């Protein structure tokens, strides 16, 4: 033994501090209970390795080391300091203490064979020490990075959902602050090429049989599945950039490599019986089994549907209307996060998807949410107004109507919205994008709903039917407006005059009569109108367009209302009846003017002579007597007339046309008034009576001549 001791020089001795990892006060306080427990386990494991190498170190020293760390934690709680400001100072102090203790705690290495030279013994011990220390550092680094990623995921979900969801316990139990990995030593040169993968573990400990543990392709399980490109990339043979040095296996994401490396460094106690693969952590086995057996161990609080991964469930709960920016081109499925999008390959290979029993639609999870469309179940109720919803996401969006929250703001105009989908559709106004095109006429629309309504023009579909009269409509709002004609409901009331309307648009147009607003101006003559429809019909005067044609006689009209009135000449329809005398009229204004003959009302008075009339057209004609205006001129003889009807009758003197024929004697006349006077010859009717002597005449002109005999007037 003495000779063997002489082979190793004093400077080759290795102490516990060479391979153990120490924390400062600030660093220790940042660790939670689980992280501190893992630290103790790793420290004890390090002690076991040192003992196996023949280095003398009592277990009480290790325990005292851990107790000192606990004392540091209590001291920090009593007198907290800013860990960022003192981190460098503590690091330097630790290096000084470590240097002093290396001089006073030398341990003799005696297990190397006598045939081995001292330099080889020293190299083995130093290599093992470096590997143990590196394993310890990387194990703790993995723990911190895992917590950081989970905590970042929780913050992201809470930010997007606005606190509207309860996250799984895996995320909700995380501390509000976590230590960073900047305080850990850098990996050695053996893994510098993978520096971007901060969680990489390069630990070369062999299994119990002295051989490297084999990692089968389809039997891997990793604790952070959300950060992987998923097993689908590995199964399809896609090349992975991260390679584990010991086993030669390639992994498709850094966190996969991180956890995969642990299978070579700690005891493997959980066995997956399907593939004979051993897993170093129970979480790995728990998440491995659903891959083989299709079992789901995480349940959705909203729909009671189950998922195979807890973090997958978080993203399932996050999904909602308009919140799915990632889309799979193979199945046109949309996802709220890129990690879910990469999961699509696994979902697409599912052999037994969930199928709705009522409509046959298939789902990969959360089928019960869809079934609520059939059952009408709405379990999520607003506490303020009592309105219910089938999904919790819809309730979160609805509650923003009460709070006024609009978290999605347009960068161009500053307008805010309650949903991201509404912001996306709004931005099309600025970009001019119209992604929805009609395949029939190639017309494009900003919104898909507008395209659906437009396509009903081509198909003639009118899915909204009135239950009272059976009339159908292509849009739902048209049916709602139509029903008000049956109920008499007029919910839109003018605040100035109290007049009510069945449509909001009619109220808006009516209010312009009070304000005098006429926003629609003709580019040709400058005339303005309160409605766009009136401007369109006015412009037909300039263009001469008459798009409405009578199918009976071929006559055309500028306005559809004129065509409707004209068609009553052919049908003989007179829908407007006088309640006093029973006389009927084809137009409403004719009935209004007729009623004035019973009441004697003459609201239209001439400002020149004071004569009054019961119709506005009569006043207009009368005013032409004072002005002498005769705007209607004959093209053949240049004779002018005050009325267009006079010009039409005059032109028949040139053409010889006599379209009005007596049915009794066959005599024809150029004007309808002449035919009417002629009919009185056959009927004996004399409607014009003298008020002085009671004598009657067939024509008004005959009465005028007769009255001169009483007045003595000489024309």
UniProtKB/Swiss-Prot annotation:
Compartments it resides in: Nucleus
Name assigned to this protein: Zinc finger protein 544
Main localization (coarse): nucleus
Organism per entry: Homo sapiens
A single MF term (Gene Ontology): DNA binding
Keyword Iron-sulfur: no
Xref: PANTHER family: KRUEPPEL-LIKE TRANSCRIPTION FACTOR, ZINC FINGER PROTEIN 384
Family in the record: Belongs to the krueppel C2H2-type zinc-finger protein family.
Positions of crosslink type Glycyl lysine isopeptide (Lys-Gly) (interchain with G-Cter in SUMO2): 273, 289, 534
Keywords for the protein's UniProt record, in alphabetical order: DNA-binding, Isopeptide bond, Metal-binding, Nucleus, Repeat, Transcription, Transcription regulation, Ubl conjugation, Zinc, Zinc-finger
One Gene Ontology term, aspect cellular component: nucleus
GO terms classed as biological process: regulation of transcription by RNA polymerase II
Record-annotated KRAB domain positions: 14-85
Task of the protein: May be involved in transcriptional regulation.
Transmembrane portions of the chain: none
PROSITE patterns for the chain: KRAB, ZINC_FINGER_C2H2_1, ZINC_FINGER_C2H2_2
Superkingdom field: Eukaryota
Zinc finger (C2H2-type) stretch: 354-374, 380-402, 408-430, 436-458, 464-486, 492-514, 520-542, 548-570, 576-598, 604-626, 632-654, 660-682, 688-710
Pfam families: KRAB, zf-C2H2, zf-C2H2_15
């Amino acid at each position: 033994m003495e000779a063997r001791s002489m082979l190793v020089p004093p400077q080759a001795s290795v102490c516990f501090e060479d391979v153990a990892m120490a924390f400062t006060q600030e660093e220790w306080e940042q660790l939670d209970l689980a992280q501190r427990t893992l630290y103790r386990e790793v420290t004890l494991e390090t002690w076991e390795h040192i003992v196996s190498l023949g280095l003398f170190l009592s277990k009480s020293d290790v325990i005292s080391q851990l107790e000192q760390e606990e004392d540091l934690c209590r001291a920090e709680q009593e007198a907290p300091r800013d860990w960022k400001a003192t981190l460098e100072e503590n690091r330097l102090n630790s290096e000084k203490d470590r240097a002093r203790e290396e001089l006073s705690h030398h341990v003799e290495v005696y297990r190397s064979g006598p045939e081995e030279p001292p330099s080889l013994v020293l190299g083995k011990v130093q290599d093992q020490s470096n590997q143990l220390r590196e394993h310890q550092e990387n194990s703790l680094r993995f723990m911190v990075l895992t917590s950081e990623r989970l905590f970042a995921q929780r913050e992201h979900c809470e930010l997007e959902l606005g606190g509207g969801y309860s996250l799984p316990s895996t995320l909700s139990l995380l501390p509000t602050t976590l230590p960073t990995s900047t305080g850990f030593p850098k990996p050695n040169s053996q893994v510098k090429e993978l520096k971007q993968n901060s969680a990489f573990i390069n630990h070369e400990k062999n299994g119990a049989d002295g051989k490297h543990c084999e990692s089968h392709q389809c039997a891997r399980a990793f604790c952070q599945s959300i950060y992987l490109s998923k097993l689908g990339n590995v199964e399809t043979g896609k090349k992975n950039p991260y390679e584990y040095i010991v086993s030669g296996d390639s992994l498709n994401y850094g966190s996969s490599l991180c956890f995969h490396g642990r299978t070579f460094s700690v005891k493997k106690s959980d066995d997956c019986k399907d593939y004979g693969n051993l897993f170093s952590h129970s979480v790995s086995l728990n998440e491995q089994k659903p891959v083989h057996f299709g079992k789901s161990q995480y349940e959705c609080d909203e729909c009671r549907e189950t998922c195979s991964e807890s973090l997958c469930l978080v993203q399932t709960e996050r999904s909602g209307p308009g919140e799915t920016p990632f889309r799979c081109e193979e199945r046109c499925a949309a996802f709220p996060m890129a990690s879910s999008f990469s999961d699509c390959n696994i979902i697409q290979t599912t052999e037994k998807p969930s199928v709705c029993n009522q409509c046959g639609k298939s789902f990969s999870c959360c089928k019960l949410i869809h079934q609520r469309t059939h059952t009408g179940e709405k379990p999520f109720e607003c506490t303020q107004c009592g309105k219910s919803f089938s999904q919790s996401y819809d309730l979160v969006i609805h509650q923003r109507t009460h709070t006024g929250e609009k978290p999605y703001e347009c960068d161009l105009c500053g307008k805010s919205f309650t949903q991201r989908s509404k912001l996306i559709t709004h931005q099309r106004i600025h970009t001019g994008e119209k992604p929805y095109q009609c395949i029939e006429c190639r017309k494009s629309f900003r919104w898909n709903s507008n395209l659906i309504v437009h396509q009903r023009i081509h198909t003639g579909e009118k899915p909204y039917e009135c239950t009272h009269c059976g009339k159908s409509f292509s849009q739902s709002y048209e049916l709602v407006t139509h029903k008000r004609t049956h109920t008499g409901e007029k919910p839109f009331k003018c605040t100035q005059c109290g007049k009510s309307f069945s449509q909001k648009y009619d109220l808006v147009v009516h209010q312009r009569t009070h304000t005098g607003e006429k926003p629609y101006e003709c580019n040709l003559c400058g005339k303005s109108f309160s409605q766009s429809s009136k401007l369109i019909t006015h412009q037909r005067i300039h263009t001469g367009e008459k798009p409405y044609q009578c199918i009976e006689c071929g006559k055309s009209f500028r306005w559809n209302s004129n065509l409707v009135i004209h068609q009553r000449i052919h049908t003989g329809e007179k829908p407007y009846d006088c309640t006093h005398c029973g006389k009927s009229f084809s137009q409403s204004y004719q009935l209004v003017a007729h009623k004035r003959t019973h009441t004697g009302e003459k609201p239209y008075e001439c400002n020149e002579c004071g004569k009054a009339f019961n119709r506005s057209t009569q006043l207009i004609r009368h005013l032409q007597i004072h002005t002498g205006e005769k705007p209607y001129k004959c093209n053949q003889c240049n004779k002018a007339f005050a009325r267009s009807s006079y010009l039409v009758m005059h032109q028949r003197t040139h053409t010889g046309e006599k379209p009005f024929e007596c049915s009794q004697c066959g005599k024809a006349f150029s004007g309808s008034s002449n035919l009417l006077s002629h009919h009185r010859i056959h009927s004996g009717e004399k409607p014009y009576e003298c008020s002085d002597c009671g004598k009657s005449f067939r024509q008004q002109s005959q009465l005028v001549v007769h009255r001169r005999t009483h007045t003595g007037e000489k024309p």
